[in-house]
Amino acid sequence: MKRAFILVLDSFGIGAAADAEQFGDVGSDTLGHIADQCEQGLANNDKREGALRLPNLSKLGLAMAHKESTGRFAPGLDADAEIIGAYGHAAELSSGKDTPSGHWEIAGVPVLFDWGYFTDKANSFPKELTDRILERAGLDGFLGNCHASGTQVLDDLGEEHMKTGKPIFYTSADSVFQIACHEETFGLDRLLELCQIAREELEDYNIGRVIARPFVGAGKGQFERTGNRRDLSVEPPSATVLQKLVEEKQGDVVSIGKIADIYANCGITKKVKATGIPALFEATLEQIKEAGDNTIVFTNFVDFDSAYGHRRDVAGYAAALEYFDGRINEVLEIMEEDDVLILTADHGCDPTWPGTDHTREHIPVIVYGKRVPAGSLGRRDSFADIGQTLATYFGTSPMDYGKNFL
């Protein structure tokens, strides 16, 4: 029975890529810099303190993968752990350092075109675009129209939004159009309808995602995003390994978290909603136990990125990694003879880096299975090596990009 479990630690980069200079990210290192801050006692909170401890991930090969990527061991990680997994680091072929590009490339389809971006920090959106969105939605105005941190924009504009009913439109360095609205005063269904309108109107702008950002709360300092985020992505430009598994092998792909949104539902046969790392982990375990032959269980742990990376919360990121490390053996314990587990990421988001954006980094490629030889996979030239490996494993037609590493 062939089953693969892909766990994406969203934003968990392990060292700057060779082309990081093109992105202003030379020297970025999500894992390494978190470990440095922990070692220096600068990443303590009510959930953790001291050096970064990831004993189980180190056994799987994380510390060695980071060493091969950067030339140094991350402090606190066990450099002498007995390795039970195959480990490597992968560079990105895709032109961007965004979520869809990373995930599509993982599934064998790198993004070799340039996304559209809204580059102006203020007055970011063309008037003709916002006019069409407002007209179709029956709205008389909007707030924002700028680059913004998703949490700061709520403090800045949330109360005015509640008073006026005007949605908050904002963007970032990514190819995104984000809409924040209060779940109770504006309405979740109404927000999702507005996002669908925006998705349609953005077709000519080549924008990767429209993101619904619902929130709740009574006023400034009390606003919180809810778990009802939706990402409306364009479809991948060619068939991913997910689609090939479903179409060629009549297999199943179980999406946990925002995976289905990222792939615009292409190649997804089941969607499981869960919010927060503990709930995502529980859902993953449940779906692994239920999975049949020719199945991929695919989970995105978005909080590493959204709650800690973008918010530059080093202690929060470290605590989340240690929580994940403390539970990963639960997956190993229920794996069957031919199963394959892949731990990876889609980009970096170094919480010590200036700004709030992603960082261009290598991603870890950590593979475990009872039939998978332990040892180094070395440097992989593309995230698409993961997709090609899955294509080989499941016996689908080969992908156009990537090399099998098993």
From Swiss-Prot:
Pfam families associated with the record: Metalloenzyme
Coiled-coil intervals: none
Reaction equation(s) it catalyzes: 2-deoxy-alpha-D-ribose 1-phosphate = 2-deoxy-D-ribose 5-phosphate; alpha-D-ribose 1-phosphate = D-ribose 5-phosphate
Protein name (record): Phosphopentomutase
Pathway assigned to this chain's UniProt record: Carbohydrate degradation; 2-deoxy-D-ribose 1-phosphate degradation; D-glyceraldehyde 3-phosphate and acetaldehyde from 2-deoxy-alpha-D-ribose 1-phosphate: step 1/2
Keyword terms, alphabetized: Cytoplasm, Isomerase, Manganese, Metal-binding
Binding, Mn(2+) 2: 305, 310, 358
Cofactor note: Binds 2 manganese ions.
Subcellular locations according to the entry: Cytoplasm
Function (record text): Isomerase that catalyzes the conversion of deoxy-ribose 1-phosphate (dRib-1-P) and ribose 1-phosphate (Rib-1-P) to deoxy-ribose 5-phosphate (dRib-5-P) and ribose 5-phosphate (Rib-5-P), respectively.
UniProt cross-references to Gene3D superfamilies, sorted A to Z: Alkaline Phosphatase, subunit A (3.40.720.10), Phosphopentomutase (3.30.70.1250)
